[in-house]
Amino acid sequence: FNTAGNMLVADFAAHNILEVNTSTKEVSIYCHEELFNQPNDICINKKGIVFASDPNWQKQTGQIWRIGSDRKAVLLKADMGTTNGICLSPDGKILYVNESVQRRIWAFDVDEKGDISNQRIFAVFNDFGFDGMKCDLRGNLYVTRYGKGTVVIISPQGKLIQEITLKGKDVS
């Protein structure tokens, strides 16, 4: 949900981020960018800056975008693996992005303007892909393991805390 209290949704088929007005249920285009591959997951910081993962599943590549209050998309990072899950640490200073096919999770520092720097590997797995991610208030990262049917919990230091097995295999 954005600072106006409206829901934002990635519309990967039409290269959009959509906004759903929670009062009227009206759907409008929040941001359209022809250079989007297939915007997939999004997260929003306390200032209302939107970060979007943008995979190209066929080519197994991806990008990261930032969308500011002007609703214009700015490419933050190209030439990545298949970007999918994306989330911010509770203080908004670290952006986590996973690459589903390559099974890597990256961490980036985030400045006040929403620019990213200091790209580093946060975690790597040898099997099964990823989908959505979210941080808890302590900064632990919860990562869905698509095809395995688990959610892993990783500490802010990158240590595996727990792996929770679910009933279904295609966890997102």
What does each model-found stretch correspond to?
Residues F1-M7, D11, E33-Q63, L76-I94, ...:
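Beta-rich, blade/repeat-based domains predominating
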Residues A4, A13-A14, T24, K47, ...:
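Surface-exposed loop/turn positions within WD40 beta-propeller blades
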Residues F12, P55-W57, S100, V110, ...:
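Short loop/turn segments immediately following the C-termini of beta-strands
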Residues N16-L18, G62-W65, R104-W106, T150-V152:
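A short loop-to-beta-strand structural motif that recurs across blades of beta-propeller domains
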Residues N21-K25, I67-R71, D109-G114, I154-K159:
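Short loop/turn segments that connect beta-strands within beta-propeller blades
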Residues E26-E33, R71-A78, S117-V124, K159-I164:
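A short beta-strand motif characteristic of beta-propeller blades
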Residues Y96-M133:
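Anionic-ligand binding region
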Residues K148-S172:
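C-terminal closing repeat unit and adjoining cap/tail of repeat-based domains
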